[in-house]
Amino acid sequence: MNVNYLNDSDLDFLQHCSEEQLANFARLLTHNEKGKTRLSSVLMRNELFKSMEGHPEQHRRNWQLIAGELQHFGGDSIANKLRGHGKLYRAILLDVSKRLKLKADKEMSTFEIEQQLLEQFLRNTWKKMDEEHKQEFLHAVDARVNELEELLPLLMKDKLLAKGVSHLLSSQLTRILRTHAAMSVLGHGLLRGAGLGGPVGAALNGVKAVSGSAYRVTIPAVLQIACLRRMVSATQV
């Protein structure tokens, strides 16, 4: 089965990601909370992608297919079939921002909207952290302050915001997504805790659930894309 990738300048940077980065990102898209392949995954049914299983650059050589998978999850399944492809990344980003109650200015660049989203996500998560989680986070970003308002300027200055959010995603959200249903109350109007434990789940509490897009996939995926973009950018400076 083909993955129809819509040329997207906001996702072109994925070609510069490492094999490990792309493999981790692809798994977030293709596998559900139990570690099983999502029934709606197109990538895992793609003959080219499957034929390269075990190849040391399976994901790097197929970055466009991975990007297409994100576009696929970002669009309504019926609309995807009608137009033959999913949504552009920016539309997915704006959609996720709205669900996370971020009033994004559409005149802002994609990078700027992502920056606001990462900051808001960190703020919301920090409020839900206990002292142990906070200390673990501070250690991960090598910070020696204890208050968020002191921490944020340091993260911005040293370009560590993406590293901090990436730590939260890898240490909590990704792990939790593998063991719990990420959208436990579909139809009840809320992504109540998103089926997620700990401060990450609590930070996403209250996110509206609608049938159009797979928010259990696109919310962590957009956060991860924002982190990857900054990591790649840092290596190219």
From Swiss-Prot:
Domain of life: Bacteria
Chain segments annotated as transmembrane: none
InterPro entries: DUF3944 (IPR025217), Ubiq_cyt_c_chap (IPR021150)
Record Pfam families: DUF3944, Ubiq_cyt_C_chap
Family: Belongs to the UPF0174 family.
Name this polypeptide is given: UPF0174 protein YaaW
Species annotation: Escherichia coli (strain K12)
Organism taxonomic ancestry: Bacteria, Pseudomonadati, Pseudomonadota, Gammaproteobacteria, Enterobacterales
